[in-house]
Amino acid sequence: MTTLTAQQIACVYAWLAQLFSRELDDEQLTQIASAQMAEWFSLMKSEPPLTAAVNELENRIAALTVRDDARLELAADFCGLFLMTDKQAALPYASAYKQDEQEIKRLLVEAGMVTSGNFNEPADHLAIYLELLSHLHFSLGEGSVPARRIDSLRQKTLTALWEWLPEFAARCRQYDSFGFYAALSQLLLVLVECDHQNR
């Protein structure tokens, strides 16, 4: 990626982690349709590989603003996709895709991080991967840890995530009939792919 800074990429990962970790509340729903968010989306679209995915997400957000009982419907979508059985869902856990759920724990230890007791999900939840990537991108800008070490850990994290993220995103597209989380997962997929190629 050439246009976005490490800190901006960190913010995108943190934002996506938040959206995939819990249902949106009224404040978040208002925020994603705000002028401030539109500016942020414009910035993301300055990165050509992200343009189509951001456009689709903006379309879903526009549809969301006219959806009856938007918050409740989106909460139902979240629950159906991420909290139910895996038959018609996109469970946000590495272990649901036959991946090593211990890998993220090793990566967190290597980064000197632990999961929060406030987040009542297994450590292999998608949001944990995204928080780790956010932390690593922020660390790149701080200069307190050698960049090579951070970059090595970033690449390991991206590789571990990429092993199951495409299937997760495909399941989001398949089972999210409204399309908000499908669009969100597509944006994440493109972001991770670009980040992974930016060695």
UniProtKB/Swiss-Prot annotation:
UniProt-annotated location(s):
Cytoplasm
GO CC field: cytoplasm
Q: Which Pfam families match?
A: Nitrate_red_del (PF02613)
InterPro entries per UniProt: Chaperone_TorD, DMSO/NO3_reduct_chaperone, HscB_C_sf, TorD-like_sf, TorD/DmsD_chaperones
Q: Which Gene3D superfamilies does the record match to this protein?
A: 1.20.120.1820, HscB, C-terminal domain
Keywords carried by this UniProt record: Chaperone, Cytoplasm
Keyword Mitochondrion in record: no
Q: Does the keyword Cell cycle apply?
A: no
From which domain of life does this come? Bacteria
Q: Name one GO biological process term.
A: protein folding
According to its UniProt entry, the function of this protein is described as: Involved in the biogenesis of TorA. Acts on TorA before the insertion of the molybdenum cofactor and, as a result, probably favors a conformation of the apoenzyme that is competent for acquiring the cofactor.
**Family matches, as HAMAP family:** TorD
Q: Which family does it belong to?
A: Belongs to the TorD/DmsD family. TorD subfamily.
Q: What protein name is recorded for this chain?
A: Chaperone protein TorD
Q: Which organism is it from?
A: Escherichia coli O7:K1 (strain IAI39 / ExPEC)
From the UniProt record, report the name of the gene that encodes this protein. Answer: torD
